Design a protein with these regions (language model features):
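Soluble catalytic regions of membrane-associated enzymes that act on cell-envelope
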Residues: 1-236
Length: 236
């Protein structure tokens, strides 16, 4: 009922709501300070990681738990597709159509790529992933979408030769170390950097790399929405 919604948000009539909705913020696109921007996509990350978290019984968030206290968290996000690459392209191109980069348009400059805004603002644009660079031909096609540099398993492994490799790539911690070095370079040059990262460690099969120790899972402490088979019982 519209009138109930108006009352709930403190309006006495529809005209009051329209006035607030019509307010425009006047901002400049020319920032005096251009910050470095890092956009990290975690493979297979879902709400169950947050819903299963228990600081004592099942610490699924690790150090992210304290970071979330000051973070803006959206818990209702939905993946654009049930697949890594379609979801990645959805973020890059804002479209459910996939795979664009492996179609006849794969080696064409796409004006609707979200990365172009950073490149036009003179950012150094980098795609960084723990998976092999030839995966889905990203080392070739992503340069057409605004990424100046693409780094993956080979580049990270060359820099950190002791890093353990998995069926899907190299451990996430090495990818983040690589990103830290890129950010330090940006500080030294004064040119801001945009880094889009795609992790691999959370991709099945779930094997923690580099001998890292993780806490055991107390199944009895998992939320009722997750049963022993790892599926949902419908009572979300």
């Amino acid at each position: 009922e519209p009138s109930q919604a108006l009352t709930k948000f403190g309006y006495s009539n529809i005209e009051e709501a329209k006035k607030d909705l019509a307010v425009r913020a006047h901002t400049s696109t020319q920032l005096s300070f251009r910050p470095n921007v890092v956009f990290t996509v975690m493979e297979s990350m879902s709400g169950d990681i947050f819903n299963s978290h228990d600081s004592l019984a099942n610490n699924t968030l690790g150090s992210l738990e304290t970071a979330m206290e000051d973070a803006v968290v959206f818990r209702k996000g939905v993946s654009i597709e049930n697949g890594t690459f379609p979801s990645l392209e959805g973020l890059l191109f804002d479209t459910p159509i996939s795979p664009i980069s492996q179609s006849i348009y794969g080696r064409k400059e796409l004006s609707f790529s979200q990365v172009r805004a950073f490149k036009e603002a003179c950012y150094r644009t980098i795609f960084l992933t723990g998976c092999p660079e030839p995966w889905r031909q990203i080392n070739d096609t992503f340069k057409f979408y605004g990424f100046e540099e693409i780094y993956g398993q080979a580049a990270i492994g060359e820099k950190f030769p002791n890093a353990e490799k998995s069926p899907w790539g190299i451990g996430d911690k090495w990818m983040f170390k690589f990103a830290e070095d890129l950010l330090k370079e940006a500080e030294g040059t004064g040119r801001p950097v945009f880094i889009m990262m795609l992790s691999t460690t959370n991709h099945p099969p779930f094997k923690v790399p580099d001998g890292e120790q993780v806490s055991k899972v107390d199944i009895s402490k998992l939320p009722k929405t997750i049963n022993l088979e790892g599926s949902y019982d419908g009572n979300m």
